[in-house]
Amino acid sequence: MENVVFIGKEIRRELKRQGRSGVWLARQLPCSNNHVYKLFSKKTMDTDLLWRISDIMDVNFFRLYMDKWERRRRIIQNG
């Protein structure tokens, strides 16, 4: 079972679902468009930045990690 959350891909997917762009996110953060597009290719991210993005987009991206952790714990407990 894969236990990795590819956070950049998840953020890009959610932006698309919300009908928003990387340019929009760059304005909200604020940072360069280039920086945001580089974030999309990252598997990991600083927690402060992820917190800011979660707040801006009104999405708890930390839940992705918690869901993976809970599934892993269930597998371990159930043998």
For the regions a protein language model found, what residue spans apply to each?
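A short, Lys/Arg-rich alpha-helix, primarily the initiator
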Residues: 1-20
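Short, charged recognition helix plus adjacent turn
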Residues: 13, 19, 38, 65-79
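Residues within the alpha-helical elements of helix-turn-helix
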Residues: 17, 28, 56
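Residue-level signal for the short linker/turn that defines the boundary of a DNA-recognition helix
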Residues: 19-20, 45-48
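Short alpha-helical "recognition helix" segments of helix-turn-helix
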Residues: 21-26
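Recognition helix of helix-turn-helix/homeodomain-like DNA-binding domains
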Residues: 30-44
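DNA major-groove recognition helix of helix-turn-helix/homeodomain DNA-binding modules
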Residues: 48-63
